[in-house]
Amino acid sequence: MSTKNVRTEKDTFGPIDVPADRLWGAQTQRSLQNFAISTERMPLALIRALVLVKKAAARVNVENGSLAKEKGEAIIRAADEVLAGQHDAEFPLSVWQTGSGTQTNMNTNEVLANRASELLGGERGERRKVHPNDDVNKGQSSNDVFPTAMSVAAVAAITEHVLPELKALRDVLAQKARAFHDVVKVGRTHLQDATPLTLGQEVGGFVAQLDHAKGHLERTLPHLLELALGGTAVGTGLNAPKGYAERVAQELAQLTGHPFVTAPNKFEALAANDALVQAHGALKGLAAVLFKVANDVRWLSSGPRSGLAEITIPENEPGSSIMPGKVNPTQSEALTMLCAQVMGNDVAVTVGGASGNFQLNVFKPLIAHNLLQSCRLLADGMRSFRLHCAVGIEPNRPRIQENLERSLMLVTALNPHIGYDNAAKIAKTAHRDGTTLKETAVALGLVTPEQFDQWVRPEDMTGHKG
């Protein structure tokens, strides 16, 4: 690194050269040197949550007199610049770092301190007017501020992205269920023909699954809204002023619009990440629902001539580089793949959540990275599936009727009239001889044509009343 392009910063390990045009300081530079691992960077959503916490803390520290007003206002201005996306390149650290997130906390402290110093007419580096630890990090420890940022980021991702997209997809499918209420079709269990239902009932099942998934996810929010800040190093609150935790939680609630509160037990809040594990469990549950929905849509649209072909889906792009005219269920494929990724992420989050030792969980960056990735994947995936697939689902009525008329399981309607064994005999004989159920039932002398027409009415077998 050319001496013309660097400045020297110091930490407790001594001096280190830092790129002159960067706002970060010594500890960030050491992390870049010591943890050049893979390409995953700390999510910007987490960085912005951490900056929000710093902003709220600065307000409270000015209010309680522990931070000079001039410094506090400069920190807040610097924080607002970061929140506006002006300094994204100043947060280069890898997810794969210290398990407490200390290096990212210090990265944030250094950037805000150097920028605040500039805003006060000072310099970056040793002669800065705002100190990263004494001012920006006042009343905090990485051990409480990082999990607080994790909670803030998780609540935002779930409430502002995942839940709205879940509702939007649910509403589109609910509209389809109503539109298809009178389309009687073959049911299928074990991938085999079963008794009839309506396409509306089938899609309505998807809607109910999504409603339950939404409820499960919403029920994880109260625990996520409990913030670790104020526990400082081990949960005792050492060096945090009285009332500090409560006031910062109030400030964060005001800044975000989410009802954050201080955690009633800071030892739990630092030593464990149970709220995030449980939230990700609900995300995994949503992924399982979406996987099932996407897979059923894929199967029901299979064809167009040799598959089930009971529904049609939008044709968005060519499907094959060798087979002309082929169109594939690409939205279902993308959605099922990302759901598989979320399921894999859940394993990592679970292991991370189980890996606390004594007073601190040290898998926090892993948990945050995977949870925020899962939220992004699910929100984007639901939006894409809704806009490019679900809104265009339509029944292929001729094919549905053809499959329905060929189904041997319509014979189930005869059970109350001729008994299970006789009904089974009709189905097996018709399947063996390639004849219709009606032809076989009459030939076997078990029913008259009039009785068959009266008793075997698919629309009466669905429980649908109008």
Swiss-Prot record:
Asked whether the keyword Cytoplasm is assigned, the reply is yes
Protein EC: 4.2.1.2
Catalytic residues, chain numbering: 190 (proton donor/acceptor), 320
Which pathway? Carbohydrate metabolism; tricarboxylic acid cycle; (S)-malate from fumarate: step 1/1
> Main site of residence?
cytoplasm
The annotated regions of Basic and acidic residues compositional bias extend over: 122-137
Annotated region Disordered: the residues are 122-143
Entries under Pfam families matching the protein: FumaraseC_C, Lyase_1
Catalytic function, reaction form: (S)-malate = fumarate + H2O
In this chain, the site described as Important for catalytic activity is at 333
Keywords of the record, alphabetical order, are: Cytoplasm, Lyase, Tricarboxylic acid cycle
Q: Please give an example of a GO cellular component term from this record.
A: cytoplasm
Binding positions (substrate): 100-102, 128, 131-134, 141-143, 189, 321, 326-328
Q: Enumerate the Gene Ontology biological process terms.
A: fumarate metabolic process; malate metabolic process; tricarboxylic acid cycle
Where does the protein end up? Cytoplasm
Q: Name one GO molecular function term.
A: fumarate hydratase activity
Q: How does it assemble?
A: Homotetramer.
Q: State the HAMAP family in the record.
A: FumaraseC (MF_00743)
Q: What else is known?
A: There are 2 substrate-binding sites: the catalytic A site, and the non-catalytic B site that may play a role in the transfer of substrate or product between the active site and the solvent. Alternatively, the B site may bind allosteric effectors.
Entry function: Involved in the TCA cycle. Catalyzes the stereospecific interconversion of fumarate to L-malate.
Identify its protein family.
Belongs to the class-II fumarase/aspartase family. Fumarase subfamily.
* NCBIfam families given in the database record: fumC_II, PRK12273.1
What's this protein's name?
Answer: Fumarate hydratase class II
Q: What is the lineage of its organism?
A: Bacteria, Pseudomonadati, Myxococcota, Myxococcia, Myxococcales
